[in-house]
Amino acid sequence: MNIALRGYSVALLLLAVFFSACGPSFQAGGDVAQGRQAMFRGDNQGALGYFQAAAQTDSNYIYGTELREGTLSYLGRAQYLNGQLAPARDTLQKALAQHKSDNLARLYLGLTVARQGDRQSGLREIENGMKRIRDFLNYMTTTFAMSFGQFWDPAQAIRKPIDTNLTMIARGNFDWSMLISNSETIAMNFEQEPDNARQQEEQQMEMNRSR
């Protein structure tokens, strides 16, 4: 297992270098990284500035090796978090046109559309986004269970709330403000999960080395 974990970390490093060290992409990658940290701190205005800069530098840049999210995805989410719903909708639609597998862009698009008043269309995207996130986590934890997959959502802190919200949607007649709040929390936790998983993996490797 130790060899597999070490190999995974090396692969992540090589891929990160590959995707971020090509011309303008290097600057875009730095802006996205700083924007993510600002977003995690709750500094949505600061995050928006970083993601705008990243999109202007390289609108096709892809961040990360697991979730693989584009600069437009991050920009659209920051616009949503800053209450800029019309620009967010346009940006998130472009992000999904680039990468249909961007589950967070899909979830945030649903939230945006719902908050604009089209709850039926918004709900469809919210539900679809949640299901895709759950399926992705299940894939990671089962396919790679003996290596890095064990560090992804180990206590199902993301998947359990997803199931709860999907059940609520299926029953109908739910509180929209609660669904939106829950969805935003799920989205933020999922965005942070690669960082959390990598940190847990590194801690486990350090423990194994010290034995």
Where are these predicted regions, by residue range?
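TPR/TPR-like (Sel1-like) alpha-helical repeat modules
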Residues: A55, L111-N138, L166-A170
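Terminal, low-structured helical/coil segments at or just beyond the last alpha-helical repeat
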Residues: N138-R211
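Bacterial Sec signal peptide processing site at the extreme N-terminus
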Residues: F19-A38
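Flexible helix-coil transition and linker loops at the boundaries of alpha-helical arrays
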Residues: T57-E66, F136-T143
